[in-house]
C-alpha cells in the first residue's frame, strides 16, 4: 500500500516537471520533419513535369 502511494506521488511529480521540457523537444522535432516534407514537396513539384515530359517522349 505504501509503495503504491510513493509510486503515485513520484509519477505525478515527474509528469508535472518533465511535461514542459518534452513539449519543446517534440515541437523542435516536428519542425525538422515539416522542413523535410517541404523540401520533398518542392523537389517533387520541380521534378514531376520533367518526368512527365520524358515519359511523353519515350512512350
From Swiss-Prot:
Magnesium recorded as keyword: no
Signal peptide (residue range): 1-23
A Pfam family recorded for this sequence: Cecropin
Keywords: Amidation, Antibiotic, Antimicrobial, Immunity, Innate immunity, Secreted, Signal
GO biological process, one term: antibacterial humoral response
Alphabetical list of PANTHER family matching this protein: CECROPIN-A1-RELATED
Family designation: Belongs to the cecropin family.
Name of the protein this chain belongs to: Cecropin-C
Amino acid at each position: 500500500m505504501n509503495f503504491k502511494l510513493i509510486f503515485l506521488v513520484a509519477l505525478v511529480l515527474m509528469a508535472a516537471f518533465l511535461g514542459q521540457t518534452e513539449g519543446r523537444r517534440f515541437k523542435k522535432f516536428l519542425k525538422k520533419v515539416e522542413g523535410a516534407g517541404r523540401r520533398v514537396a518542392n523537389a517533387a513539384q520541380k521534378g514531376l513535369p520533367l518526368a512527365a515530359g520524358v515519359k511523353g517522349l519515350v512512350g
